[in-house]
Amino acid sequence: MASSQGKNELKFADWMATLPESIHSIPLTNLAIPGSHDSFSFYIDEASPVGPEQPETVQNFVSVFGTVAKKLMRKWLATQTMSFTGQLGAGIRYFDLRISTKPRDPDNELYFAHGLFSAKVNEGLEEINAFLTDHHKEVVFLDFNHFYGMQKYHHEKLVQMLKNIYGNKMCPAIFAQEVSLKYLWEKDYQVLVFYHSPVALEVPFLWPGQMMPAPWANTTDPEKLIQFLQASITERRKKGSFFISQVVLTPKASTVVKGVASGLRETITERALPAMMQWIRTQKPGESGINIVTADFVELGDFISTVIKLNYVFNEGEANT
């Protein structure tokens, strides 16, 4: 998993550790960081029930067509083909996480979910932690941004799970502009947890969701997506938060019907890839530039290496900081 950057070899599993020293003190809000959309969706289980957030039309479709319907759903819901470990080794550092309970589950277990249920949350978090233990200078952003069927007890369970798994690796919520690699390394922090629920206000290591805004274009048109991304960056607040550019196309119902057997990757993502990659290559990180960039099927089109290499503009003294 390596690529060249000038005379330097970028080892993507340790790309943060190998950034030039001149970048170590730059706030992470100003760096370019690759992330994945619906990060857990590689694990989506066709044998699972339909998620509680799905509309009645989808529930009815599955009740009539059963396993066939779920196989077709997975083609459109699974936005990643790599496990957490695979994504981390390839350089992904931001994870988009959606959590759900299962109806009538006596164990009150927590699952990743997007339409269908995915892996158990504790298993996914343990997998990420194992990587961090082996790569002690790498830092991850865990963004818990959707919760389905969760009561106060479930949030308490998730908070305790985070404590048990990550412990002192978690960076408490502070002013975002203070967080640099140097700061995190000095304190042995490797995990920033963003939590889009009022629960975040009660727990020191949970960063409020508003500190990780992720404007959503909600379009199937690559040109409209790029216009939206550019406008969002232009309007980005100069200080106070991280920022996500979702380089992601969202299928409409009519799109799904037309390409029902092909799936998201073939019908939309691969066709739009050249335009989206060209947009990324023209960007610069910095206060008024891109920060975290997310995509579907992150292994496509040199997405990860392209985002990481944008950071080397700081070394050339050209960044907007």
Swiss-Prot record:
Assigned GO CC terms: cytoplasm; glutamatergic synapse; synapse
Gene3D superfamilies the record matches: Phosphatidylinositol (PI) phosphodiesterase
InterPro entries: PI-PLC_domain (IPR051057), PLC-like_Pdiesterase_TIM-brl (IPR017946), PLCXD1/2/3 (IPR042158), PLipase_C_PInositol-sp_X_dom (IPR000909)
GO BP terms: lipid catabolic process; signal transduction
One term of GO molecular function: phosphoric diester hydrolase activity
Domain PI-PLC X-box as annotated: residue spans: 22-197
Protein keywords: Cytoplasm, Hydrolase, Lipid degradation, Lipid metabolism, Transducer
Active site: H37, H114
Main location: cytoplasm
Organs and tissues of expression: Widely expressed, with highest levels in brain, followed by heart atrium. Not detected in small intestine, nor stomach.
Subcellular location: Cytoplasm
The species this protein was found in: Mus musculus
Record protein name field: PI-PLC X domain-containing protein 3
UniProt lineage: Eukaryota, Metazoa, Chordata, Craniata, Vertebrata
A Pfam cross-reference name: PI-PLC-X
